[in-house]
Design a protein with these regions (language model features):
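N-terminal flexible/basic segments that precede or flank functional cores
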Residues: 1-44
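Short, charged recognition helix plus adjacent turn
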Residues: 3, 96-100
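Amphipathic alpha-helical interface surfaces
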Residues: 21, 37, 41-45, 54, ...
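Short alpha-helical DNA-recognition segment
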Residues: 47-70
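Key DNA-contacting residues within the recognition helix of helix-turn-helix
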Residues: 70-71, 85
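Residue-level detection of the helix-turn-helix DNA-binding "recognition helix"
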Residues: 74-75
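DNA major-groove recognition helix of helix-turn-helix/homeodomain DNA-binding modules
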Residues: 81-97
Length: 100
């Protein structure tokens, strides 16, 4: 019998590609602004972190405790913008702004 991947597993696999991860983060950030819900972007960053080594590896690169990093990216967490940017950088990506 053929095994199928779940949505999350498939997403994490796709997010290992930096181009895909960049497009995903851009789309989620745009959606966050449109809906005034920054939680969307925060969870997108969490997905990218999971795809690029997980909480332990990325928090180590950021030189922060895994526990506080995990809490800040949880659904109930309120991550600072600087935390999100540092996590993105630790995943080998960067945040850019362009004229509208």
């Amino acid at each position: 019998m053929r095994k199928y991947k779940g949505y999350k597993e498939h997403l994490i696999e796709k997010l290992r590609d930096s181009e895909y991860a960049s497009a995903y983060l851009n789309a989620c950030l745009e959606n966050s602004f449109e809906t005034k819900n920054m939680g969307i972007f925060q969870l997108a960053v969490r997905d990218v972190v999971e795809a690029h080594g997980g909480m332990t590896e990325i928090s180590s690169k950021m030189e922060v405790s895994r526990e506080s990093f995990y809490r800040s990216l949880s659904q109930k967490g309120k991550a600072r913008f600087s935390t999100l940017v540092n996590a993105i950088k630790a995943c080998g990506l960067e945040l850019e702004f362009h004229p509208a």
